Curated annotation (Swiss-Prot):
Interacts with ARL6. Interacts with ZCCHC17. Interacts with SRSF2. Belongs to the ARL6IP4 family. It comes from Rattus norvegicus. It comes from the Eukaryota. This is ADP-ribosylation factor-like protein 6-interacting protein 4. The lineage of its organism: Eukaryota, Metazoa, Chordata, Craniata, Vertebrata. It is found in: Nucleus, Nucleolus; Nucleus speckle. Involved in modulating alternative pre-mRNA splicing with either 5' distal site activation or preferential use of 3' proximal site. InterPro entries: Nucl_RNA-splicing_assoc_SR-25. Keywords: Isopeptide bond, mRNA processing, mRNA splicing, Nucleus, Phosphoprotein, Ubl conjugation. One of its GO terms (cellular component) is nuclear speck.
């Protein structure tokens, strides 16, 4: 009986040991599976994190490239605008210089023309002064000396004298002469200075009355002669 009980005990022990071993194996397998799951999860998390980092780095690279391209485009536009502004300013400066040169040339030409005209006038005046025309006295003398030649009338002499140039002294002397001219039709006497300037004669009241009487008589006779009233 004792032997049988010992066998039963050994069998129960072996069964309990087998159960414990199976439990331990199941626990180990569950632990291994949990470990494998955790490792796979960690690996997936790591992979996802690495992919997220790569995407972020790509986005950053794209942003940096965009910012660099925008900065380069802005710099190129600013450089082009600066070059255009500099070229426009240079063009304006060149135009201003060209206009100034034209103005200077025109001024120089005008000055040269004025100098030439002044020189020509001075030469003409000098020649006229050096070679004055003959006066009336010279014509009278020549006419008196040349008795055999044709005699010139007063009109011809005046025409010849008008054609000849006169000096300033001769002109002043001619204009300073005052003479009395009597109108043959009316009998009026006038004071004429030079070529035709009429002067007023200052007289007394009595002389003024006599002059008016003579003038009215002469005017009446001239009117009657024109009208044919006189015999």
């Amino acid at each position: 009986m004792a032997h049988v009980s010992s066998r039963k005990r050994s069998r129960s022990r072996s069964r309990s040991r087998g159960r414990r071993g199976s439990e331990k194996r199941s626990k180990r397998s569950s632990k291994d599976s949990s470990r494998n799951c955790s490792t796979s999860k960690s690996q997936g998390h790591k992979a996802s994190s690495t992919s997220g980092v790569e995407e972020r780095s790509k986005h950053k690279a794209q942003r940096t490239s965009r910012s660099s391209s925008s900065s380069s485009s802005s710099s190129s536009s600013s450089s082009s605008s600066s070059t255009s502004s500099s070229s426009s300013s240079d063009g304006r400066k060149k135009r201003g210089k060209h206009k100034d040169k034209k103005k200077r040339k025109k001024k120089k030409k005008r000055k040269k023309k004025m100098k030439r005209k002044g020189k020509e006038k001075a030469v003409v005046v000098h020649q006229a002064e050096a070679l004055p025309g003959p006066s009336l006295d010279q014509w009278h003398r020549s006419a008196g000396e040349d008795n055999d030649g044709p005699v010139l009338t007063d009109e011809q002499k005046s025409r010849i004298q008008a054609m000849k140039p006169m000096t300033k002294e001769e002109w002043d002397a001619r204009q300073s002469v005052i003479r009395k001219v009597v109108d043959p039709e009316t009998g009026r006497t006038r004071l004429i200075k030079g070529d035709g300037e009429v002067l007023e004669e200052i007289v007394t009241k009595e002389r003024h009355r006599e002059i008016n009487k003579q003038a009215t008589r002469g005017d009446g006779l001239a009117f009657q002669m024109r009208a044919g009233l006189l015999p």
